[in-house]
C-alpha cells in the first residue's frame, strides 16, 4: 500500500468517524482530487485488504435499526395517564375491601368482586390496544430500508464484481451504474459511459423531473438539487450509464440523514389537543375526587368514631371497624362515580366511526387521535409535486406554424394525467389535420422512447414523463383521414402505434446535454428517409434553416419568424411551461441507403455522439409544445375553502422557484398580480431570515421552494412552537421527517412512497389535496360530537357524585353500590354517548375559524349548566330513595302496593341508631316473586330492605341520563328546533340502554349480582315523574345560553385573533 493510503487509514483510525460530505465536499472537487482523497483509481478499485480496513472504520452500508422499547416499558407507559391511575387505585382498594365486606356493605358474594374485576378488565384491554399501537408506530424506518439498493456492480482488485451485496460497499468503492439501477450509496460521478445520465431523485428532493448528471464539480454550498455531479442512495437511474465513486455509506448518506430525522421526530411526538385536555381534566378530577372523598369521610367520622369529654378533654374513644370500612367503601364508590370509566371506550368508538366516514371520502386514518386533531388544524403545509399537482407531465399548449410566414397557431390542450381520454385539444380539426400538424404528431410519436400503460384503472408512464406526455398528446391529436376511429381494444397508444408502422425507426441519436436534443432516422412509407428531431426550442431553432407552413410547404426561416417563435417561447416560460421544439429534415446523403445495418459505412458516424450536431443541421422547424406538471382540478377550490375556514396554506417543495410560483398563482395560493417577493423564498433563503417565526406569521399563503428535508422539518417545528396545529402533506422520502413531526402527517396513497405512508397519520387514497379539506371538516364535526358526549358523560358523573355526597351528608343508607355505578358508567351511558357521535354536522362548520388547540373543552358556563343538571340528578336519585321509605304515594302515584312499612325522615337519617329504638317493627314487602321479611332483625330494613329503594334510585339515574342525552344533541339549540329524530341512532341507543337496564332488572341472576329487584308499573311511573323534569331544566338553561351567547363569546372572539408574541 502506498504512503497516501497509509496516511488515510491512520487519519480515519484517529477520527474513528466516516468521511462524509460534511468533512470532504466531493461535489466541489474534481475527479482527480476525489480519487486522491479516497486513495483509489477507477481502473482498479479498492483492494480486498483495504475494503476490510474500511469496513472496520465505516461499518456496513445499511441504515441503523433503533433499539425497540421493551415490552415491560411499554406496559408501564400505558399507565402513564391520570384517569388510568385513578381507576387502578380504585380497583386495588375495591379488591382489598371485598375481602372485608360484611353485611353492612350491602353486597353479597360475587357482587363484591365484580367492580374491581371489571375495572381491571378495562385497564388490561386499554393496555393491549396501547401496546399494539406502539409496536406499529416505527414502521417508517423499516420502509426506508426497503428503498435501498440490494446489489451493486463494483470494481475490486482490478476486477469487475457483479451483484455484490450493496451493504458491503465502503467509501472509495468504484461502482458502475446502468439504466434502471437503484443507487446503492451516495456517490460522486467520475465518468459517463453514455452521452447522458439522468436520475429520478424526486422522492428525495421533490423535483418533478429526472435530473441530468455530469462529472463537473459544483459550488461547495450547493443544495441537494444543485449537486449535479452526485447521485444519492435510493434514487433511480432512468437514462444512461456511468462510473461512480462511493463517498458516503449507511447513516451518512442523504437517506441516512432522513432516517435520523425520522427517529428524532418520533422522539418529539406530542399528545393530541384532545389528549392534553383529557389529561388536564384527569388532574382536576383527581383533586376534586380527593377533596370530596375526604369531605365525605369527615362528615361520617361521627358514625364510626365517638368519644366523651372528661374535664374538657376527649376520653373513652369508641371505634367501629365495620362502619369505618363501610364509609371507606362509600368514598371508593364516590371515586368510581366521579370517573367516567366508559369515556375512553366511547372516544375510541367515536374516532373509529370517524375513520370510517373519512375512508368513504378517500382519507385513510392510520392513527385514531388524528381524527380529532384534524378539526383544529390551523396550517396546512403542502408539498407541490404529486399533491397540489398530478405528478404526471402533460402538454398544456401546442404552437404550430401558420399559413404564411410570420404567423403562428396556438392550441390549448386539456388534461392533467397520462390518460389519453383526459381532456381534449380546443378548436382541434379532428381527422382533418394539415401537413404541419401531422409532422408534429409524427415527431412526437416516433422520436420518443417512453410508453404509457394502464394499471389498476391508473395510466402510468414507462420512461421519461416528458416523453410519455408527448405520446398522450399524439393520442389527443388523433390520426388523419379518419383512421382515429379505428378500433384497437386495449391499445392505449393507438395513434402512436399507427405512426410507428408508417415510419419505421432505423437509428437513434441519443439526447445529450450539449446539443439538448434527440433525433431518430426513419424509413418512411413514402419511400423517403427522414431525420426527426425534438429538443430545447432554442437549440433546435438555432440548427434550423427553414420552417414548414400549414400546407406542408417549406419557407426560409427569417429573423422575424425566429423572433416571433422566441417571444412565444418566453411567454410560455413565464407560465412555468417546459418547452420542446420539433423539426425534421431529409437524412444526410451518407445515410440515403442506410437501413440500420452495422455494416453500412455511415453507421460509424452514429457511434460517436460528437457527430450528432452536424447530422442534426439544416433542419425544418415545425412547431413546439409547452409541458408542465399540472395542478389538480379540485385544488383551487380546496384552497379557497381553506381560506374560508381560516386555515393557512403553505407550499413547501423541492422544485425550482419560478415553476412553484407559477403553480401557486394558478391554484390560488397567491393572486395573479400579487407581489410575492416577501412570501416566496427558497429553503436556504428562509434559513438566513433573522426572524423566522415572524415570517411564518404572515397572513395568506407562503411558498418555500428548493426545500431540503431539514428545511421542511424546521418550518414545521417553528410553526408548532408558535402554537399552530400543523398538517403536513407529502409523498416522498424527503417529506417523511416533517410528516412524522407534524401534528397531522398526510401521505399520498397512490404516488406516495412506503416511507411517507408509514411516517404519516393519514393516507389519501386519491392523492387529492381537496380530500384533506373534506377530512378537516369531518374532524371538526367529530370534535363537536365528542364535546357533546363528553359533556353528557361528565354531567352524568357529576350527578352520581352529587347523589353519593347527598347520601353521606344526609346520613341516609347508601342509595347505590359501586357495581351499579360502574354498570351505568360503562354500559348504560355507552350507547347514547356513542350515538351522539352521529350528530349531523353544522352547515357552516367550514365557514368558522379553527378552534385553538388550547380552547377549553368545558367552559365556565357549560360547567355551571352541568353542575345544575348534576345537582338535579343527585336530588332526584336521593329524593326517590327517601320517597319510597317515607311516602305511600307521590303526585297521585300509589306506592303502597308492595306492602312496605313507612318510616319518618328522622328515622331514615338516623338509621344507625335503629337498635336503640323501642318497639320498632316493619312489615314484609314483595318485589316481583320475592318477599322480604325482617322479623328477626327489623334494623335490616335499612340494609337488606333498601333493595327496592336502591333499585328506584338506579332506575331514576338511568332514565335521567337517557333524557339528558337528548339535551346533548345541541349545545344551545332547543329540542323544539333540533328534535330527537335528527339523530335516529340516539333514539336506538336509548332503547338499547333501557333494554339493558330491563335485562338486569328482570333476569334473576343478574338482579342478584347488581343488588336490585323488579319494579311495578306504578314504580316506573314514579321513575318517569322524577326523571322528565331534567329536559325542562336544561331547556331553560339553553334559553339563557342563547340570550347571553353574544356577551360570552365576544371577548373570546377578540382574544383568538390576537397571536401570543
Swiss-Prot record:
This magnesium-dependent enzyme catalyzes the hydrolysis of ATP coupled with the translocation of calcium from the cytosol to the endoplasmic reticulum lumen. Also regulates manganese ion homeostasis by pumping it into endomembrane compartments. Can also transport zinc. One of its GO terms (cellular component) is plant-type vacuole. The chain crosses the membrane at residues 71-91, 116-135, 279-298, 328-345, 787-806, 817-837, 858-880, 951-970, 984-1002, 1018-1038. It is an enzyme of class 7 (translocase). Signal peptide: none annotated. PROSITE patterns: ATPASE_E1_E2 (PS00154). This is Calcium-transporting ATPase 1, endoplasmic reticulum-type. It comes from Arabidopsis thaliana. Mg(2+) binds at residues 731, 735. Its EC number is 7.2.2.10. It holds the Pfam family Cation_ATPase. Residues 92-115, 299-327, 807-816, 881-950, 1003-1017 are lumenal. The active site is at residue 383.
